[in-house]
C-alpha cells in the first residue's frame, strides 16, 4: 500500500485525492515553519552549555584533526570508527553524531565548531517533528482506512478526520515540548536518536497495518523501518530496545488483551501479584529518601503488569497469532539489522584498540547506565513525563485517565502508541537510573496521545470549545517564546552557564601559559574545545576516565609539577568566603602546601550551575605558611 494512501486517510468521504494531498502539504508546511522557528534561530549565540554538548563537540573536533592527519586508509578508518578524546578511546556512544558534524563542517568548508553541532541537532529536531506527524498519521488514520470510527475520549467518535488532526496537533505539541525543544537546542545526541526511532516506529506501524489489511507487510514500511533502525543503532545503544518495544511489542500487547478460550487462568491471578511484591521488596533496598518508597511501589506495579502480559501470552491462542504477525512484519529482520550494526561497530572498535580495552570501556558504560529496580528511577521518569512535552504532557494525562476509566476497545494499530509510551517507560524505570534525556525518543508518543486528547476534547464540547485559531495561537506563542529564549534570552539571563566567555578571556590574557593550566575536581570539555588543549583535572572527579577525557592527577603530583615548573594555573570552583570555610577547595589546597594568588577575571562561569570558577596561580609554600592573597575573593 503506497504511503500516500495512509497520509490521505485523514479526510472526509467527500474529499478528492487532490484535496487530501493538498491538506497534507499544508500540514507539513505549517509544521516545517513552526519547527524551523523553534530550532534554528541563533544557533551559536550562546556558548557551549554543559558537559554533554562540550563532549560531543570536543570529540568531533579531535576526530576531524585525526582524519586530516591520516596517512593510510587504516588511519582514516580508525579515526572514523573509534571516537577519541585527548587520545583516549571514547566509545560510550556510537559515532553517528560525530560523523554528522564532520559532514556539516565539510559542507561549509571548515572544521567542526559549535554551530555545526547545533545545526545537526536542530535539523534533527525539525525532522523529528515531521516524523511525529508521519507516525501519527500511520498509527491513528491507518487504523481507520476502512472508514470505521473508534470510541475516543469522552464519548467522541474518532473518525478519519479527527485522527488526521490528532497527528497534526501531536506533532505541533512535540515541536513546542519543553524537554524536546531543550534537547534540540543544546547539542544532545538524543535528538538524533528520537528522529531515527520515531521514523522506525512509524514505519513498523505502517508495516503492521498493511499486513493486517492485505496479509502482506508493505515493502516500503519494512525497508524504512530497517534503515531507520540501523541509523538509530549508530546513534545510541538503547535504540534497538526502544524500537523493539515501541514498534513491535504493540503486537504482543494487542494479543495479550484478546479474550481467550476460557476465563482467567490461575497463573493470571497469582503470578502478577507475587512478581509485583518481589520486585517491590528488591527495590526497597535502594531507597535513600522517604519519597522513594512510592517509587518502589511503582516498580512493583510495573513488574506486576509485565508479568500479567507475559502470562497472558503463554496461551497458544494469543502467542501464535502474535508470533505470526511479528514474522509478517519482518520484525526479526529489522531488529536483527539494528543489533548487527551495533555488534559490527563494536567488533571494529575491538580490532582497532584491542579486545581488553574494548571490554573495559564497554563495562564502564554498562556500570554507569544499567541500574536494576532502583526506586527513584520511576519517580524521576514520571516527573520528566509531566514536563517533557509541555502542554502535550498534561493533555496526555487526560488521555491516560480516559484509557483507565473507560477501557475502550482500541484499534490494533493504536496499541503501537500504548507500547511506545508504556513499555519504554517500564524499561527505563526498571533498568535505568531515571535520567530524563533518555526518554527523549518517547516524547513524540506522549505528544501524539496529547494530540488525540485535544481533538477529542474540542469535538466533545462543541458549545464550549475554543476556536481552532486560539489553540493555534497558543502553540505559536510557545514556539516563539522558546525560540527567543534559546536564541537571545538564555544569554541575557544565564550567561554564566557557558564556558565561552571565560575561555575567550583566558586566551586573551597576556603572558598566560595555557599549557600549565589545571582544573580542581572538575572537567570541562567545553573549555577544552575553546582553548584547543586538554585541561588536566586535579583530584577526584566521580566519573570514569572516558568521561573526564583522561586520568586526573593527585595533589602530590600537582605539587611535583609546580616544583618542576615554578608555577601552575588552577581553575577552582570557589565562592565568596571560601577562604574562610574549613574544607572548601581553597582551604584544602592551602593545607596541601600551596600558595594561591587570585588572578582576577571578569567572565563568570559556573560549572554545572554551581560555584563560579576562579583562576589562581599556584606556587609551593611550607605547610604552615598562610595562603597568599587570601583576602581576595573570586567573582560572585
Per-range role (PLM):
Residues 481-582, 603-620:
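Short periplasmic/luminal acceptor-recognition loop of GT-C membrane glycosyltransferases, typified by
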Residues 55-70, 227-228, 235, 240-414, ...:
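Transmembrane-lumen/periplasm boundary regions of multi-pass, lipid-linked membrane glycan transferases
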Residues 55-89, 96, 103-107:
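Extracytosolic helix-loop segments that constitute the early lumenal/periplasmic catalytic or substrate-binding loops
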Residues 29, 448, 454-485:
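Signature aromatic-anchored transmembrane alpha helix within multi-pass, membrane-resident enzymes
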Residues 183-184, 190, 432-462:
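Hydrophobic/aromatic-rich transmembrane helices and adjacent perimembrane loops
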Residues 119-160, 199:
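Transmembrane-helix motifs of polytopic, lipid-linked glycan transferases
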Amino acid at each position: 500500500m503506497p504511503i500516500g494512501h495512509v497520509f490521505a486517510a485523514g479526510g472526509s468521504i467527500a474529499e478528492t485525492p487532490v484535496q487530501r494531498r493538498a491538506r497534507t502539504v499544508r500540514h507539513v508546511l505549517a509544521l516545517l515553519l513552526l519547527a524551523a522557528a523553534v530550532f534554528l534561530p541563533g544557533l551559536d549565540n550562546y556558548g557551549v552549555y554543559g558537559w554533554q554538548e562540550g563532549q560531543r563537540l570536543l570529540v568531533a573536533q579531535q576526530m576531524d584533526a585525526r582524519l586530516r592527519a591520516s596517512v593510510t586508509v587504516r588511519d582514516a578508518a580508525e579515526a572514523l570508527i573509534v571516537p577519541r578524546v585527548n587520545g583516549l578511546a571514547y566509545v560510550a556512544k556510537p559515532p553517528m553524531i560525530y560523523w554528522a558534524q564532520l559532514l556539516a563542517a565539510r559542507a561549509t568548508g571548515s572544521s567542526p565548531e559549535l554551530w555545526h553541532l547545533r545545526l545537526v541537532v536542530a535539523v534533527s529536531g525539525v525532522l523529528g517533528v515531521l516524523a511525529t506527524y508521519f507516525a501519527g498519521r500511520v498509527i491513528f488514520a491507518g487504523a481507520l482506512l476502512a472508514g470505521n470510527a473508534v470510541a475516543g475520549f469522552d464519548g467522541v467518535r474518532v473518525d478519519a478526520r479527527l485522527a488526521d488532526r490528532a497527528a497534526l496537533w501531536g506533532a505541533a505539541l512535540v515541536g513546542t515540548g519543553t524537554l524536546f525543544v531543550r534537547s534540540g537546542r543544546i547539542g544532545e545526541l538524543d535528538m538524533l536518536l528520537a528522529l531515527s526511532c520515531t521514523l522506525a516506529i512509524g514505519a513498523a506501524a505502517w508495516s503492521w497495518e498493511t499486513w493486517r489489511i492485505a496479509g502482506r507487510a508493505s515493502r516500503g514500511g519494512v525497508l524504512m523501518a530497517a534503515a531507520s533502525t540501523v541509523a538509530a543503532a549508530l546513534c545510541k545503544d538503547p535504540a534497538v530496545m526502544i524500537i523493539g518495544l515501541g514498534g513491535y511489542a504493540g503486537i504482543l500487547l494487542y494479543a495479550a488483551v484478546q479474550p481467550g478460550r476460557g476465563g482467567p487462568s490461575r497463573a493470571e491471578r497469582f503470578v502478577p501479584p507475587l512478581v509485583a511484591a518481589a520486585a517491590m521488596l528488591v527495590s526497597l533496598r535502594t531507597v535513600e529518601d522517604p519519597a522513594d518508597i512510592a517509587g518502589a511501589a511503582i516498580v512493583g506495579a510495573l513488574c506486576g503488569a509485565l508479568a500479567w502480559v507475559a502470562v497472558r501470552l503463554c496461551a497458544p491462542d494469543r502467542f501464535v497469532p502474535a508470533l505470526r504477525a511479528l514474522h509478517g512484519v519482518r520484525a526479526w529482520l529489522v531488529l536483527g539489522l539494528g543489533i548487527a550494526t551495533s555488534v559490527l561497530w563494536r567488533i571494529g572498535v575491538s580490532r582497532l584498540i584491542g579486545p581488553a580495552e574494548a571490554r573495559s570501556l564497554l563495562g564502564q558504560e554498562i556500570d554507569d547506565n544499567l541500574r536494576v529496580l532502583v526506586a527513584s528511577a520511576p519517580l524521576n521518569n514520571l516527573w520528566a513525563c509531566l514536563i517533557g512535552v509541555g502542554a502535550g504532557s498534561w493533555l496526555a494525562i487526560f488521555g491516560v485517565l480516559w484509557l483507565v476509566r473507560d477501557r475502550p476497545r482500541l484499534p490494533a494499530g493504536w496499541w503501537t502508541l500504548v507500547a511506545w509510551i508504556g513499555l519504554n517507560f517500564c524499561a527505563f524505570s526498571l533498568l535505568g537510573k531515571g535520567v530524563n534525556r533518555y526518554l527523549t525518543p518517547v516524547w513524540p508518543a506522549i505528544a501524539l496521545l496529547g494530540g488525540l486528547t485535544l481533538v477529542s476534547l474540542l469535538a466533545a464540547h462543541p458549545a464550549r470549545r475554543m476556536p481552532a485559531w486560539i489553540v493555534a495561537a497558543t502553540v505559536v506563542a510557545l514556539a516563539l517564546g522558546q525560540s527567543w529564549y534559546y536564541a537571545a534570552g538564555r544569554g541575557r539571563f544565564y550567561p554564566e552557564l557557558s564556558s565561552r566567555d571565560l575561555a575567550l578571556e583566558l586566551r586573551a590574557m597576556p603572558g598566560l601559559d595555557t599549557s600549565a593550566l589545571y582544573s580542581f575536581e572538575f572537567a570541562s570539555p567545553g573549555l577544552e574545545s575553546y582553548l584547543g588543549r586538554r585541561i588536566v583535572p586535579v583530584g577526584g572527579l566521580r566519573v570514569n576516565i572516558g568521561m573526564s577525557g583522561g586520568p586526573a592527577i593527585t595533589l602530590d603530583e600537582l605539587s611535583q609539577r609546580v616544583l618542576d615548573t615554578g608555577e601552575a594555573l588552577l581553575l577552582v570552583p570557589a565562592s565568596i568566603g571560601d577562604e574562610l570555610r574549613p574544607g572548601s577547595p581553597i582551604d584544602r589546597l592551602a593545607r596541601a602546601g600551596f600558595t594561591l594568588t587570585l588572578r582576577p577575571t571578569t567572565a563568570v562561569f559556573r560549572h554545572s550551575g554551581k560555584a563560579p570558577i576562579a583562576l589562581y596561580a599556584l606556587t609551593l609554600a611550607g605547610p604552615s605558611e598562610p595562603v597568599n592573597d587570601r583576602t581576595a575573593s573570586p567573582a560572585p
